Design a protein with these regions (language model features):
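All-alpha RGS (Regulator of G-protein Signaling) helical domain and cognate RGS-like helical scaffolds
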Residues: 40-49, 58-71, 76, 80-132, ...
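Acidic, low-complexity proline/glycine-rich segments
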Residues: 1-10
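A long-range scaffold signal marking pre-active-site subdomains of enzyme folds
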Residues: 8, 28, 35-39
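Alpha-helical scaffold segments that form or flank carboxylate-/histidine-based iron centers
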Residues: 16-33, 52-75, 119, 143-146, ...
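Conserved small/polar residues in nucleotide/adenosyl-binding loops
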Residues: 160-162
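A broadly conserved detector of short glycine/acidic/proline-rich loop/turn motifs that flank catalytic sites
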Residues: 8, 133, 142
Protein backbone atom coordinates (compact mmCIF):
# COMPACT_ATOMS: atom_id res chain seq x y z
CA UNK A 1 0.00 0.00 0.00
CA UNK A 2 1.12 3.53 -0.71
CA UNK A 3 2.07 6.10 1.93
CA UNK A 4 2.46 9.86 2.05
CA UNK A 5 6.15 10.68 1.53
CA UNK A 6 7.91 12.64 4.22
CA UNK A 7 9.10 16.00 2.95
CA UNK A 8 12.80 16.85 3.01
CA UNK A 9 11.96 20.26 4.47
CA UNK A 10 9.65 21.78 7.07
CA UNK A 11 6.20 23.13 6.23
CA UNK A 12 7.58 26.65 6.72
CA UNK A 13 10.62 26.18 4.49
CA UNK A 14 9.01 27.25 1.20
CA UNK A 15 7.70 30.60 2.47
CA UNK A 16 6.99 33.10 1.04
CA UNK A 17 6.53 31.20 -2.27
CA UNK A 18 4.30 28.60 -0.61
CA UNK A 19 2.86 29.36 2.81
CA UNK A 20 2.75 26.83 5.62
CA UNK A 21 -1.05 26.71 5.27
CA UNK A 22 -0.85 26.02 1.51
CA UNK A 23 1.80 23.35 1.94
CA UNK A 24 -0.23 21.69 4.71
CA UNK A 25 -3.29 21.72 2.46
CA UNK A 26 -1.53 20.28 -0.60
CA UNK A 27 0.69 17.76 1.17
CA UNK A 28 -1.21 16.77 4.28
CA UNK A 29 -4.72 16.90 2.87
CA UNK A 30 -4.85 16.74 -0.97
CA UNK A 31 -1.90 14.40 -1.45
CA UNK A 32 -2.93 12.21 1.48
CA UNK A 33 -6.47 11.97 0.07
CA UNK A 34 -5.13 10.74 -3.28
CA UNK A 35 -3.16 8.04 -1.47
CA UNK A 36 -6.07 6.98 0.74
CA UNK A 37 -8.40 6.81 -2.26
CA UNK A 38 -5.86 4.90 -4.35
CA UNK A 39 -5.27 2.35 -1.60
CA UNK A 40 -9.03 1.86 -1.22
CA UNK A 41 -9.52 1.45 -4.98
CA UNK A 42 -6.75 -1.14 -5.44
CA UNK A 43 -7.15 -3.16 -2.24
CA UNK A 44 -7.57 -6.82 -3.12
CA UNK A 45 -7.15 -6.25 -6.87
CA UNK A 46 -4.38 -7.08 -9.33
CA UNK A 47 -3.35 -3.41 -9.16
CA UNK A 48 -2.21 -3.89 -5.56
CA UNK A 49 0.90 -5.76 -6.77
CA UNK A 50 1.93 -3.16 -9.37
CA UNK A 51 4.34 -0.24 -9.13
CA UNK A 52 2.80 3.23 -9.11
CA UNK A 53 3.95 3.88 -12.69
CA UNK A 54 2.48 0.58 -13.87
CA UNK A 55 -0.82 1.38 -12.13
CA UNK A 56 -0.91 4.72 -13.96
CA UNK A 57 -0.20 3.15 -17.35
CA UNK A 58 -2.63 0.26 -16.91
CA UNK A 59 -5.51 2.28 -15.43
CA UNK A 60 -5.16 4.91 -18.15
CA UNK A 61 -5.53 2.29 -20.86
CA UNK A 62 -8.40 0.53 -19.11
CA UNK A 63 -10.37 3.72 -18.45
CA UNK A 64 -10.34 3.22 -14.68
CA UNK A 65 -10.76 6.90 -13.82
CA UNK A 66 -10.81 6.54 -10.03
CA UNK A 67 -7.64 4.48 -9.94
CA UNK A 68 -5.90 6.54 -12.62
CA UNK A 69 -6.71 9.96 -11.17
CA UNK A 70 -5.58 9.08 -7.66
CA UNK A 71 -2.47 7.12 -8.74
CA UNK A 72 -1.41 9.81 -11.16
CA UNK A 73 -1.97 12.66 -8.70
CA UNK A 74 0.04 10.73 -6.09
CA UNK A 75 2.89 10.36 -8.60
CA UNK A 76 2.61 13.99 -9.76
CA UNK A 77 2.75 15.30 -6.21
CA UNK A 78 5.71 13.05 -5.35
CA UNK A 79 7.70 14.67 -8.16
CA UNK A 80 6.38 18.13 -7.29
CA UNK A 81 7.67 17.91 -3.70
CA UNK A 82 11.07 16.76 -5.01
CA UNK A 83 11.20 19.74 -7.39
CA UNK A 84 10.66 22.16 -4.50
CA UNK A 85 13.38 23.23 -2.11
CA UNK A 86 13.91 25.93 0.49
CA UNK A 87 15.55 29.01 -1.04
CA UNK A 88 14.99 27.37 -4.44
CA UNK A 89 16.43 28.53 -7.67
CA UNK A 90 20.13 28.71 -8.24
CA UNK A 91 22.07 26.96 -10.95
CA UNK A 92 20.69 24.16 -13.05
CA UNK A 93 22.85 21.02 -12.82
CA UNK A 94 25.39 21.22 -15.65
CA UNK A 95 24.29 18.01 -17.40
CA UNK A 96 20.65 19.17 -17.49
CA UNK A 97 21.65 22.68 -18.55
CA UNK A 98 23.65 21.27 -21.48
CA UNK A 99 20.70 19.12 -22.56
CA UNK A 100 18.32 22.09 -22.28
CA UNK A 101 20.62 24.20 -24.48
CA UNK A 102 20.94 21.33 -26.97
CA UNK A 103 17.18 20.76 -27.25
CA UNK A 104 15.81 24.30 -26.86
CA UNK A 105 18.69 26.40 -28.22
CA UNK A 106 19.18 28.28 -24.94
CA UNK A 107 18.10 28.21 -21.33
CA UNK A 108 16.12 31.40 -21.94
CA UNK A 109 14.09 29.76 -24.74
CA UNK A 110 13.33 26.79 -22.48
CA UNK A 111 12.30 29.12 -19.65
CA UNK A 112 10.03 31.08 -21.98
CA UNK A 113 8.41 27.90 -23.32
CA UNK A 114 7.96 26.46 -19.81
CA UNK A 115 6.37 29.64 -18.47
CA UNK A 116 4.13 29.94 -21.55
CA UNK A 117 2.93 26.36 -21.09
CA UNK A 118 2.08 27.15 -17.49
CA UNK A 119 0.23 30.39 -18.07
CA UNK A 120 -1.75 29.00 -21.00
CA UNK A 121 -2.96 25.89 -19.15
CA UNK A 122 -6.72 26.25 -18.81
CA UNK A 123 -7.86 25.32 -15.32
CA UNK A 124 -5.98 23.06 -12.92
CA UNK A 125 -3.11 21.05 -14.28
CA UNK A 126 0.63 20.65 -14.60
CA UNK A 127 3.48 22.03 -16.67
CA UNK A 128 6.21 19.45 -17.45
CA UNK A 129 9.78 19.16 -18.64
CA UNK A 130 10.08 15.58 -19.86
CA UNK A 131 12.37 13.34 -21.84
CA UNK A 132 10.66 12.00 -24.97
CA UNK A 133 12.92 9.41 -26.52
CA UNK A 134 16.21 11.36 -26.33
CA UNK A 135 14.85 14.91 -26.46
CA UNK A 136 13.63 17.27 -23.75
CA UNK A 137 10.12 18.60 -24.36
CA UNK A 138 7.81 20.98 -22.51
CA UNK A 139 4.20 19.88 -22.19
CA UNK A 140 1.19 20.71 -20.08
CA UNK A 141 -1.58 18.46 -18.88
CA UNK A 142 -4.99 18.92 -17.30
CA UNK A 143 -5.94 17.57 -13.89
CA UNK A 144 -4.24 14.23 -13.11
CA UNK A 145 -2.81 13.48 -16.54
CA UNK A 146 0.96 13.12 -16.77
CA UNK A 147 3.58 12.35 -19.45
CA UNK A 148 4.06 8.74 -18.29
CA UNK A 149 0.97 7.71 -20.25
CA UNK A 150 2.56 9.20 -23.38
CA UNK A 151 5.80 7.22 -22.94
CA UNK A 152 7.76 10.21 -21.66
CA UNK A 153 9.95 10.50 -18.58
CA UNK A 154 9.02 13.58 -16.49
CA UNK A 155 11.96 15.49 -15.01
CA UNK A 156 10.48 18.76 -13.71
CA UNK A 157 7.00 20.07 -13.17
CA UNK A 158 5.04 23.01 -11.89
CA UNK A 159 1.58 22.91 -10.37
CA UNK A 160 -1.05 25.12 -11.94
CA UNK A 161 -4.07 25.52 -9.70
CA UNK A 162 -6.93 27.76 -10.70
Amino acid sequence: MFELPKLDYSNLALSPIMSEQTLDLHHGKHHQTYITNLNNFIKGSDYEKLSLEDIIKKSSNEKKAGIFNNASQHWNHNLFWKCMKPNGGGNVPSKLESKIKEDFGSFEKFREEFINAGVTQFGSGWCWLSLKEDKLVVTKSPNAENPIIHNMKPILLSLIHI
